[in-house]
Amino acid sequence: MSSSPSPSPSSSSSSSASSSASSSPSSSSKLTWLDIRSVGEARAAIVQEALHHRVEALVADDPAHLADLPPTVAKVLLVVGKQIPEEFGEATVVVVDPSKHGVTPAELALKHPEIEFGRFVEIIDAPTLEDACESSRTEKWSVLLFRDPTKIPLEIVIAAAARASGSMVTIAQDLEEAEILFGVLEHGSDGVMMAPKTVGDAAELKRIAEAGIPNLNLTELRVVETSHIGMGERACVDTTTHFGEDEGILVGSHSKGMILCVSETHPLPYMPTRPFRVNAGAIHSYTLGRDERTNYLSELKTGSKLTAVDIKGNTRLVTVGRVKIETRPLISIDAEAPDGRRVNLILQDDWHVRVLGPGGTVLNSTELKPGDTVLGYLPVEDRHVGYPINEFCLEK
């Protein structure tokens, strides 16, 4: 399930969907199809916005509405509730409903080899769910409309098409549903088709599709000093995620330097493991949230997004379930990067609070000493209300 639609019509195989991917997002990118069938007078503005944000495809039911579009966007003709037109105009992909039209995409492809064809399936019961599974396994393009709000049928289709080479595009009713569709079964639909309600929706749909966060280059930091600093408030961050043993969140007193704090995944002598929790540090500390923005631990709450990081720098977005702020004894840890930059982290002064070192070594906060090595991250930008910005800012 990894094709990208051809951006322009071609009579040669060299412009097929797979070979045209170089001018589109990579095969791992989520596809965004914008449905302009019912946008009315706002069509021109919405189309321009979609082109500006490089939406992969525009979808219409009239070939005339696909005319004069640039070759940077795929032109999808979705024929639902009407007869298949005799001419497809500039359409590069045509999607039909074999149950209504009495003709299959394969049969149409024999007559029009220059066009890619797909199948539309509306899922309302078990037989149509099986149709969707079959389409996703065999067709180059499957456009799926799930009438019920449950996502279990989509999970079944995704699993059925796991080894398929075609692409599945699921219709979303709004931006909130689009975000959910992209994440079902941790894989999500290959693409989402949505009818915009207003100018701005195309940009937001594209942002949601590209919400994957970049991996980070972690740095080995040498501990230079630790000190017991008395009582203060620290935050335990309980997420809705099961962390890996080599995974945690980045926390630091300054926005330009953070240390990788591990979750309570590793066994403890006096309590069960809590792999969803990171005992993260003093409440003034920064952590890394969505879109490379920093957040104070004190401002996190149910529903907040955080960047989880493993020892190789692989990242994923996780959701906060709750934050517990309590008064505890604190320990300050100062570490230094190879280039001399200093990093500070203030943690609860207790043996069971841990950070990660090279190779996933688990280091208890109370046992850290000068010369020990921990893993950290050194952003280069200063911050303004959490966002990275190039300006002068001295933190100490």
Swiss-Prot record:
Protein name: 3-amino-4-hydroxybenzoic acid synthase
Function: Catalyzes the cyclization of 2-amino-4,5-dihydroxy-6-one-heptanoic acid-7-phosphate to yield 3-amino-4-hydroxybenzoic acid (3,4-AHBA).
Domain of life of the source: Bacteria
Chain spans, region Disordered: 1-29
NCBIfam families with a match to the protein in the record: PRK02290.1-3
Activity regulation info: Partially inhibited by 0.1 mM pyridoxal phosphate.
GO biological process, one term: aromatic amino acid family biosynthetic process
InterPro entries xrefs: DHQ_synth
Record lineage: Bacteria, Bacillati, Actinomycetota, Actinomycetes, Kitasatosporales
Enzyme Commission number, as recorded: 4.1.99.20
pH profile of the protein: Optimum pH is 6.5-10.5.
Cofactor note: Manganese. Cobalt, iron and magnesium can be used to a lesser extent.
Sorted UniProt keywords: Amino-acid biosynthesis, Aromatic amino acid biosynthesis, Lyase, Manganese
CC cofactor: Mn(2+); Co(2+); Fe(2+); Mg(2+)
UniProt-recorded Gene Ontology molecular function terms: 3-dehydroquinate synthase activity; oxidoreductase activity
Family: Belongs to the archaeal-type DHQ synthase family. GriH subfamily.
Temperature dependence: Optimum temperature is 30 degrees Celsius.
PANTHER family the record matches: 3-DEHYDROQUINATE SYNTHASE, PTHR33563
